[in-house]
């Protein structure tokens, strides 16, 4: 059984303040910290061989917190791919106690452009709720100077196919800690959702989604699988 675990980061400070965040590098709120720890509890008995996060701190910290009580007791270490010598471990004994963690901006949240840092209710009052709904939930319409969900998938899906999927095919169990829209674009592909179906896909913060790769398709499971 080969597993793919997806987790939207815990609540961030700007989630709490109802602000558009996008690529702005905002940390977790106190609630988000607790969500990340609770998420870890729900997956702590699931095997994990590799971790992938975005380059944004809320994604990274969520993954690290989620792994603190993992039953394997293995320690995540960040692989600096631009300088692999920096993170090379020269002890086989220690290597066996570690889990590699890779970061990529391909997994970053969709970039919200001119909306970043603005209050969502205030933006709705300024531009109208229907326009903001199109920016936030439509598949191909992007906010000013930002990305649509389609645009986000144009970077997320190639990275998944080139870097992550081959590991799943090798039987490696993968944990991805990322963002609402980067994960929505990925789930759209995994579950073969239409452009209309993905519009209603909501991913709460800090709640894992578990898939099994059967060798031919992805099957969704409850996190309690472990």
From Swiss-Prot:
Site, Transition state stabilizer: residue positions: 179
Stored InterPro entries: His_Pase_superF_clade-1, His_PPase_superfam, PG/BPGM_mutase_AS, Phosphogly_mut1
UniProt GO MF annotations: phosphoglycerate mutase activity
Keyword Lyase annotated: no
Domain of life: Bacteria
Keywords, comma-separated and alphabetical: Gluconeogenesis, Glycolysis, Isomerase
Coiled coil: none
Family matches, as Pfam families: His_Phos_1 (PF00300)
Keyword tRNA-binding annotated: no
Enzyme Commission number(s) of this protein: 5.4.2.11
Binding residues for substrate: 8-15, 21-22, 58, 109-112, 120, 136-137, 180-181
Catalytic activity: (2R)-2-phosphoglycerate = (2R)-3-phosphoglycerate
Annotated signal sequence range: none
Record-annotated active site: 9 (tele-phosphohistidine intermediate), 109 (proton donor/acceptor)
Pathway(s) the chain acts in: Carbohydrate degradation; glycolysis; pyruvate from D-glyceraldehyde 3-phosphate: step 3/5
GO BP field: gluconeogenesis; glycolytic process
Family: Belongs to the phosphoglycerate mutase family. BPG-dependent PGAM subfamily.
Function: Catalyzes the interconversion of 2-phosphoglycerate and 3-phosphoglycerate.
Protein name: 2,3-bisphosphoglycerate-dependent phosphoglycerate mutase
Organism whose genome encodes this protein: Chlamydia trachomatis serovar D (strain ATCC VR-885 / DSM 19411 / UW-3/Cx)
Name of the encoding gene: gpmA
């Amino acid at each position: 059984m080969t597993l793919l675990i997806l987790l939207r980061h815990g609540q961030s400070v700007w989630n709490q303040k109802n602000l558009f965040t996008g690529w702005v590098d905002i940390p977790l709120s106190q609630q988000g910290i607790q969500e990340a720890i609770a998420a870890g509890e729900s997956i702590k008995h699931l095997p994990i061989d590799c971790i992938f996060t975005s380059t944004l701190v809320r994604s990274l910290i969520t993954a690290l917190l989620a792994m603190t009580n993992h039953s394997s007791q293995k320690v995540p270490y960040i692989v600096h791919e631009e300088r692999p010598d920096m993170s090379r471990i020269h002890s086989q004994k220690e290597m066996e106690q570690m889990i590699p963690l890779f970061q990529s901006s391909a997994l970053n949240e969709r970039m919200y452009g001119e909306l970043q840092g603005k209050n969502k209710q205030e933006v709705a009052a300024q531009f109208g709720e229907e326009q903001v709904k199109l920016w936030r939930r439509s598949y191909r319409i992007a906010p000013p100077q930002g990305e649509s969900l389609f645009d986000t998938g144009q970077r997320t899906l190639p990275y998944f196919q080139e870097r992550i999927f081959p590991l799943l095919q090798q039987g490696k169990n993968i944990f991805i800690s990322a963002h609402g829209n980067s994960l929505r674009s990925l789930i759209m592909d995994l579950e073969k959702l239409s452009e209309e179906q993905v519009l209603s896909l909501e991913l709460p913060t800090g709640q894992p989604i578990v898939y099994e790769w059967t060798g031919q398709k992805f099957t969704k499971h409850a996190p309690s699988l472990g």
